[in-house]
Design a protein with these regions (language model features):
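Juxtamembrane transmembrane-helix termini in multi-pass membrane transport proteins
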Residues: 1-34
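Transmembrane-helix boundary and interhelical-loop signature of multi-pass inner-membrane proteins
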Residues: 38-56, 126-127, 149-181, 194-195
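Juxtamembrane boundary at the C-terminal end of a transmembrane helix
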Residues: 189-201
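Transmembrane helix boundary and interhelical junction motifs in multipass membrane proteins
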Residues: 1-4, 111-123
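Alpha-helical multi-pass membrane helix bundles of inner-membrane/thylakoid proteins
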Residues: 49-60, 64-112, 159-177
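Short alpha-helical packing/oligomerization segments
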Residues: 131-152
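Interfacial segments of multi-pass membrane proteins
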Residues: 5-14, 18, 120-135
């Protein structure tokens, strides 16, 4: 998808890249906000004294650790996920802004397409643990915006050479991004475990 929606590709389809990308970013942010809000509302259905009990916080920490193990495919395990991705047949069939809005919303929600990292599930777990609608919405908003960043990075891609250069940079940066995600999950799991154990107490 990243290779398909670029100034170079959109120009060939007589579409405006900035409009497609704006629709993509806004709908990804909205999708993330909605799923974060929904997770927080579901979490709020559980009494706070249970959510923030040592058992509740410990369960959240365990889920983050489980996500790390699944990401690493320990014992041949795999992260549970849908087997579907956004429908690239939309490109060329619909107007650019429709494609941008449709793709952005699906990727912003995160769990309706292929889930490649447990960080997606971690956002839902943390939003539910908080149980506060505005915090959940904010977590989801940040998630949706971060998901949209790679497409924004296509700005300035006006020929094949520039497109391949960006794709090479993305490929080269993927291992570092994976490490950052795993460190973040580990830090979050450690903080939750510390809280569940009562800190220094």
């Amino acid at each position: 998808m990243l290779a398909s929606i670029s100034p170079f590709g959109e120009r060939a389809r007589a579409s405006r890249w900035w409009l497609t990308t704006t629709a993509y970013v806004l709908s990804s942010a909205l999708g993330g906000t909605l799923v974060g809000l929904l997770s927080a509302l579901l979490g709020a259905a559980v009494p706070e004294r249970w959510r923030w009990s040592p058992a509740g916080v410990g369960l959240a920490a365990a889920l983050l650790v489980l996500g790390l193990l699944l990401d690493a495919r320990v014992g041949g395990s795999r992260l549970p996920s849908w087997r579907r991705q956004v429908d690239e047949a939309w490109i060329g069939r619909y107007r650019g802004w429709v494609v941008g809005a449709g793709f952005g919303a699906q990727l912003g929600v995160g769990v309706v397409t292929i889930v490649t990292s447990s960080t997606t599930y971690a956002v839902l777990v943390l939003a539910a643990l908080g149980g506060t609608p505005w915090v959940g919405a904010l977590l989801g908003l940040v998630f949706g915006l971060v998901r949209a960043l790679p497409l924004v990075g296509m700005v300035g891609v006006h020929d094949r050479e520039a497109l391949w250069a960006v794709l090479r940079r993305v490929e080269l940066g993927a291992p570092a991004a994976e490490v950052v995600a795993r460190v973040g999950l580990l830090a979050g799991a450690s903080a939750l475990a510390w809280t569940a154990l009562g800190g220094v107490a």
